[in-house]
């Protein structure tokens, strides 16, 4: 074996580049940006900026819209805060519902007032207010929440209202406008004077020193547009709209119908402006009589409560009341007097121009020929209501479907007139006296 000094000269010299490969230097920010730019197109930066702007706009829209409604009524899981909810539940103790029957005022300070509460089936207590309640929040006769230890008032509660009464409030506005109601131009103007003008321009009535009308009766044959006009009113105004069917107030047990009417007006008084629409009022508003058996006593009690709420000892407030019926001659005189019902609007049969307008309204969404003579079809439908004219349009569409055509022609409408008007005369909903007068 050769000595060490001999074979060291044959050893391959160490390359500094290989050492650098084994221990590479760390990358700085410029190198990282350069690596990120590899395999990217010329518009990558612009697309990334547009994506960030889109996400920011979408986030603002979601924050503005809020939580979407779900079938379960729960918020999305991303909005849950279980820890905070548990802490809040541990801090807040369950309360007992009581009624404040009397307020004992203190001459020195209102904060030292005493309150007499009545706990149902327990006893009456004289208590004070909790730390979170102001003396101005509590009134005599209202429901309050009390703690279980000292019975101190911790929370003012809203009045108790039957859920069936709460469900009468119309949440979503109907899609019917005044332009969708044909043949009722004069009736719509009189209706808007009573409903919309006092809500939009109350100063006119104040200057004249008169109270605006608060009750209106819509009467006429079936199918002339009474309920349709009420739906248009609900679409037009921003006031709370409550729809009541007369038969809903006819209850089995004594006093239930009167209680529902009372709670209905209590709920209406809590609103800034409210419109109550009683459809088919003849179900509870018939003339009072004694049949000897007492079968209609409960219905009469319900009507008496309605009469009292309309114009009784307590003021009605900013509540407009609409009634609709096709039998005005059967209603009680006390219900029809001015002060309770200030204006009566008759919905009669439409004239020739009104019938043509109604046909155009119902045919607006149909696939029809352009050269249909609506005045001719309207002239062939004398003494017909708006509902019967709508049936004519529906039957014309059925004739077109039966013939496997994509559009309805004038002949289809003429055949529909023959079927609806001529074939259903014995089932006509028009009153006899109106047929005679026409």
From Swiss-Prot:
Location of region: Disordered: 1-31
Keyword Nucleus: yes
InterPro entries attached to this UniProt entry: 26S_Proteasome_ATPase, AAA+_ATPase, AAA_lid_3, ATPase_AAA_core, ATPase_AAA_CS, NA-bd_OB-fold, P-loop_NTPase, PRS7-like_OB
Subcellular location: Cytoplasm; Nucleus
Coiled-coil residue windows: none
Gene Ontology MF term list: ATP binding; ATP hydrolysis activity; proteasome-activating activity
Signal peptide: none
Physiological role: The 26S proteasome is involved in the ATP-dependent degradation of ubiquitinated proteins. The regulatory (or ATPase) complex confers ATP dependency and substrate specificity to the 26S complex.
Protein name: 26S proteasome regulatory subunit 7 homolog
């Amino acid at each position: 074996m050769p000595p060490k000094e001999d074979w060291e000269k044959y050893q391959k010299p160490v390359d500094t580049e290989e050492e650098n490969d084994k221990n590479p230097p760390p990358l700085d920010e410029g190198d990282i940006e350069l690596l990120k730019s590899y395999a990217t197109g010329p518009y990558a930066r612009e697309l990334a900026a547009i994506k960030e702007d889109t996400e920011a706009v979408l986030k603002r829209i979601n924050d503005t819209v809020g939580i979407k409604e779900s079938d379960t009524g729960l918020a999305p899981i991303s909005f849950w805060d279980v820890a905070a909810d548990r802490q809040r539940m541990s801090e807040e103790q369950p309360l007992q519902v009581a009624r404040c029957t009397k307020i004992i005022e203190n001459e020195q300070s209102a904060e030292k007032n005493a309150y007499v509460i009545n706990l149902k089936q327990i006893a009456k207590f004289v208590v004070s207010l909790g730390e979170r309640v102001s003396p101005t929040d509590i009134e005599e006769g209202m429901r309050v929440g009390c703690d279980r230890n000292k019975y101190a008032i911790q929370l003012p509660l809203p009045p108790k209202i039957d859920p069936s009464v709460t469900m009468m409030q119309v949440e979503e506005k109907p899609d019917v406008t005044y332009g969708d109601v044909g043949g009722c131009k004069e009736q719509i103007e009189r209706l808007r004077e009573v409903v919309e003008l006092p809500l939009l321009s109350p100063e006119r009535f104040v200057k004249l020193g008169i109270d605006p009308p608060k009750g209106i009766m819509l009467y006429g044959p079936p199918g002339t547009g009474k309920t349709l006009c009420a739906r248009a009113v609900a679409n037009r105004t921003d006031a709370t709209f409550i729809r009541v069917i007369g038969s809903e107030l006819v209850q089995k047990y004594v006093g239930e119908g009167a209680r529902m009417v009372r709670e209905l007006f209590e709920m209406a008084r809590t609103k800034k402006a409210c419109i109550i629409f009683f459809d088919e009022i003849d179900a509870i508003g018939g003339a009072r009589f004694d049949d000897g058996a007492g079968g209609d006593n409960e219905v009469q009690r319900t009507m008496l409560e309605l009469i009292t709420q309309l114009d009784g000892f307590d003021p009605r407030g900013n509540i407009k009341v609409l009634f609709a019926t096709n039998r005005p001659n059967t209603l009680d005189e006390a219900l029809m007097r001015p002060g309770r019902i200030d204006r009566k609007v008759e919905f009669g049969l439409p004239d020739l121009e009104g019938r043509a307008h109604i046909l155009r309204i119902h045919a607006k969404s149909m696939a029809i020929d352009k050269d249909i003579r609506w005045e001719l079809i309207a002239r062939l439908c004398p003494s017909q209501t708006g509902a019967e004219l709508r049936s004519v349009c529906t039957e014309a569409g059925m004739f077109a479907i039966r013939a496997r055509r994509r559009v309805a022609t004038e002949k289809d409408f003429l055949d529909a007139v023959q079927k609806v008007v001529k074939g259903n005369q014995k089932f006509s909903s028009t009153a006899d006296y109106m047929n005679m007068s026409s």
